[in-house]
Curated annotation (Swiss-Prot):
Any Pfam family hit: ABC_tran
Organism: Paraburkholderia xenovorans (strain LB400)
Annotated protein name in UniProt: Arabinose import ATP-binding protein AraG
Gene: araG
Domain ABC transporter: 5-240, 240-497
Record EC number: 7.5.2.12
Binding site for ATP: G37, E38, N39, G40, A41, G42, K43, S44
Function: Part of the ABC transporter complex AraFGH involved in arabinose import. Responsible for energy coupling to the transport system.
Amino acid sequence: MSATLRFDNIGKVFPGVRALDGVSFDVNVGQVHGLMGENGAGKSTLLKILGGEYQPDSGRVMIDGNEVRFTSAASSIAAGIAVIHQELQYVPDLTVAENLLLGQLPNSLGWVNKREAKRFVRERLEAMGVALDPNAKLRKLSIAQRQMVEICKALLRNARVIALDEPTSSLSHRETEVLFKLVRDLRADNRAMIYISHRMDEIYELCDACTIFRDGRKIASHPTLEGVSRDTIVSEMVGREISDIYNYSARPLGEVRFAAKAIEGHALAQPASFEVRRGEIVGFFGLVGAGRSELMHLVYGADRKKGGELTLDGKPIKVRSAGEAIRHGIVLCPEDRKEEGIVAMASVSENINISCRRHYLRAGMFLDRKKEAETADRFIKLLKIKTPSRRQKIRFLSGGNQQKAILSRWLAEPDLKVVILDEPTRGIDVGAKHEIYNVIYQLAERGCAIVMISSELPEVLGVSDRIVVMRQGRISGELARQDATEQSVLSLALPQSSTALPGTDAGTETAAQQAA
């Protein structure tokens, strides 16, 4: 089998950080090559070199035995390379069709033929088995749908080499199955593919070979995954053994700290009520579109409620905006870090301290920069945030380190009472997940009421004290930790026509397959 793509001793240095250090491996024709490593290990940097966004400081990229050097995304695309990044790149106010054909819209005498563009896109989407409306604006689509647009864009270019960075991080199971079929079809068509994922199941199901990164270096390359254990890969990734990633231990729970009663909103099929005690972690599980995020946006004041009541420490409160929620000590860590969580052009220190700067004012006017720096340095060390300094722009950090900085923001807030976490470990490696779970436990031990939305069922089962399940815009049930199993949770999450699961392996498999 010939190597279509070869990375030969690739090195890349940023100020204060060696992102890649002598990385070499081959990606063969007709092969899906998995790439694994902790956040900040250098995987995405390598893909940015392949995509022409960065140039290597040393080493060579070779295609079909010839050295290539991409100085722009356009030169990479022209060479038959398609790179789909974890942080999506699209024009929100253009339609699906316009985004898919950006730069190659059919035209006549300088006029874009929109009818022909929509027809072409509709035919190609149907052929790929992707259910997207070519006329829909990207801004109106869910994150999962936007991710499918990015994937389809690469496939429409008929690329020879396709690199996917966490492509399923926001996809439902059905969308993931569509993607897997596309990848298998491309492999059969002799394309060469790189597949980055933190989901071990996907690597074993889809990949023919796998390379492991750690701290910018290639630690191992496995030409086949047969006989390679998951423990081996985890140990190669993190440099240590993680016996229990969740590290859960029971803690005493206090009185009800936060309660939502009969919350109504446009995305909910019926009023929703729940409560969370001091020190309690309540996991919210459901399929994509079940209404979990929508409910929390109503509670947080990000979306307008049609009705309902909120109480905090037994007293009624009004929350009509995110600012009002924060003043009550209620915070939301959003699913979409890039759009809603980080201030991309600000430093790591500024992002950590953004919510608690009012505590650093001297004489009510002057910011105590020393205290701000001390707080940032403390949490960078505590959460092992990989950054050359607190002054580094947060946009240059990996997704996992950005997430840790966002969590630090709330750990630094002394008046915190309620924390809502929406997919807190999406796109994050196993080592960073372990650290983030410890942060969640620290918040709970402080007496915070924690709500954790997650589409990863093992995570919900492993971290939560209690699990609330949503289905089709309503709360379908709740389970205590000791009563919760994969099957009992899924039976509450699936549409009612599919809930007759108990006792059959086939039923359990069907349930698992439909879970996000």
